[in-house]
Amino acid sequence: MLIPSPGGGAPTGVEKPALQVRITGAILALIARFLSGASVRWIDSQPDTCQRVYFANHTSHLDAIVLWSALPPDVRTLTRPVAAKDYWTAGRVRHYLATRVFNALLIDRTEIKVHQSPVDVMIRGIGHRYSLIVFPEGGRTSGDEISEFKSGLYYLCKKRPDLELIPVYIDNMNRILPRGEVLPVPLLTCISFGPPIWLEAGEPKTDFLRRAREAVRRLKEG
């Protein structure tokens, strides 16, 4: 479990989560895979504990959980979903799951400060050990079309160009937990992990975001 420093900055070290937390995480991963019936494809890439940014399309509140649960346990332990603080702190159960089980990196969408931008929070939160799960569309979409990517992914990679970027396409999640619904409907989904990309030296923001979005779109069509 990642332990923040007293000032809320970078982690002070990597500690194994308590047995209860590990068991809870394993059970939730099994439940998520059962409800989604998720099949997992790795296309020209393999699971790895190196630092990565998994960037995916976003249609459901369950996206982060299902993607996280699709990773092998050793990779999952080192991967932090980026999540909305207002949603995941609304209630004790959500807060416990986000902070203790998923080790989520919570972003405050209501009070963004210049010295504490979401990108800076992510940079501090991963240090030189953790990977991230992000959704560059910036919010959930209601259909199958992948929206234009927001600029956060570009600025994250500009500050950490060494990070390996893995495109991910999550299929059918908007039908498992439609927008506005509370209970999931058991259906089959597929999670496709694509080949890694990197921000190239001098690559313009618009070109990079278009290329990253295209990497996810190709997985959808494949």
Describe the predicted segments one by one.
Residues 5, 96, 131, 143-206:
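A cross-family acyltransferase "interaction/gating" segment
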Residues 46-111:
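Catalytic core of membrane glycerolipid acyltransferases/transacylases, capturing the structured
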Residues 46, 62-63, 69, 114-147, ...:
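N-terminal/domain-start segments enriched in small and hydrophobic, helix-friendly residues
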Residues 84-88, 138, 170-174:
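Short beta-alpha junction loops
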Residues 14-37, 90-103, 177, 181-186:
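Alpha-helical membrane-targeting segments
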Residues 50-51, 77, 128-130, 163:
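Short coil/turn segments at beta-strand junctions that form active-site/ligand-binding loops
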Residues 1-8:
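Soluble, non-transmembrane catalytic domains of enzymes that act on hydrophobic metabolites at membranes
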Residues 20-21, 28-58:
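Helix-to-loop junction immediately C-terminal to a conserved catalytic motif
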